[in-house]
């Protein structure tokens, strides 16, 4: 009996499954997915023990009950995904998410080559830094056809990283190594062809998160921002979502830093690390709406392709990462939510 594992099989996000017609359903407010997210799959799973992650070894559910970034990730043949994607002009990019598994690097290279041979889609890779020990591995991804990579640092500080992903949970990941791999990736792919993932709400202050975003920017990596959502069965299932006002402020801070309009040094924080002054007038920035959209790798049009509709919150709202340009009424809500 054939094992349904990578590279022949991959998991897709629920949004991708709906868009490709594997499942029936529609998107709230007619949102359209622009980037396919694929996840490597092995029977042994991921060796990480990250306390907030749906794929964690420490999660108290069976493999078939696992979600990742809030939603189900059904398993399909890679070839069938490719065939269905060919007829979807709205899809601009595909991102391959590695997991920490001995075969992941080899299989990722195979999947990149297949995608570049059989489609005209741009290819990104969300890499597992713990498996990367030399720049050559990243150069191989670029030669295979990937044009961008992402690195999920997730936690905004060394202390939180160790506590939730590293030695504090018996996990294999190391903060310094992750940042070393960010530098390797920038060298291999070029400045700002690399993204770091950061999750707001793991216990950091707004000042600490702004500093992490700035560190990425200084290194040559853009930030792709997520809001913590508790995964059922994970050690952090009982933790609350970060307050919406906190997330909105960090979204705007990220935009200012990544668009090179200002820096974390120019921003002011109170004694609790809460952002109270962006160092500039923010009215016009809030009005354009774009700072509050999902941040991710771009598509053919130069706009975000990895827009992950409702992968960060329930469609019933409030929307944290807008998968489309916010409407005027959304902007008014955002202004009220920011509490500045």
Language-model regions: role of each:
Residues 16-59, 93-96, 148:
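N-terminal pre-triad scaffold of radical SAM enzymes
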Residues 106-125, 170-192, 241-266:
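Alpha-helix-loop-beta-strand connector modules within alpha/beta enzyme cores
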Residues 124, 128-131, 168, 181-207, ...:
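Conserved strand-turn element in the central/C-terminal portion of the radical SAM core barrel
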Residues 85-88, 115, 141, 185, ...:
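Generic structural signal for hydrophobic
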Residues 57-105, 120-137, 141, 146-179, ...:
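Core AdoMet radical
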Residues 92-114, 201-208:
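Conserved glycine-rich "GG(E/T)P / GGGxP" loop and the immediately following alpha-helix
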Residues 133-144, 200-218:
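Catalytic cores of alpha/beta
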Residues 1-36, 188, 210-340:
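Auxiliary Fe-S-binding modules of radical SAM enzymes
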């Amino acid at each position: 009996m054939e094992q349904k594992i990578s590279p022949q099989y991959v998991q897709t996000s629920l949004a991708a499954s709906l868009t490709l017609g594997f499942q029936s359903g529609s998107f709230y407010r007619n949102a359209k997915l622009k980037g396919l997210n694929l996840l490597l799959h092995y029977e042994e799973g991921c060796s990480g023990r990250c306390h907030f992650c749906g794929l964690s070894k420490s999660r108290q559910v069976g493999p078939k009950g696992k979600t990742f970034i809030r939603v189900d990730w059904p398993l399909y043949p890679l070839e069938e995904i490719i065939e269905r994607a060919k007829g979807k002009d709205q899809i601009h990019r595909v991102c391959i998410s590695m997991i920490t598994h001995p075969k992941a690097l080899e299989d990722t290279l195979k999947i990149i080559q297949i995608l570049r041979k059989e489609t005209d889609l741009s290819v990104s890779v969300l890499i597992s830094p713990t498996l990367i020990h030399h720049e050559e591995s990243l150069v191989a991804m670029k030669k295979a056809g990937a044009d961008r990579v992402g690195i999920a640092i997730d936690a905004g500080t060394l202390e939180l990283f160790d506590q939730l992903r590293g030695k504090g949970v018996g996990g294999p990941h190391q903060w310094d190594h992750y940042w070393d791999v960010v530098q390797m990736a920038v060298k291999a792919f070029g400045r700002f062809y690399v993204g770091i993932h950061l999750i707001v709400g793991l216990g950091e202050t707004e000042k600490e998160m702004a500093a992490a975003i700035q560190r990425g920017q200084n290194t040559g990596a853009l930030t792709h921002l997520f809001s913590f959502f508790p995964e059922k069965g994970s050690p952090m299932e009982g933790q609350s979502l970060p307050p919406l006002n906190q997330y909105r402020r960090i979204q705007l801070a990220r935009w200012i830093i990544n668009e090179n309009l200002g820096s974390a040094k120019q921003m002011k924080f109170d004694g609790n690390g809460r952002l109270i002054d962006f160092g500039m007038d923010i009215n016009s920035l809030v009005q354009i709406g774009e700072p509050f959209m999902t941040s991710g790798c771009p598509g053919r049009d130069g706009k975000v392709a990895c827009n992950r509709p409702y992968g960060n919150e329930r469609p019933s709202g409030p929307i944290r990462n807008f998968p489309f340009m916010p409407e005027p009424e959304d902007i008014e809500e955002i202004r009220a939510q920011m509490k500045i």
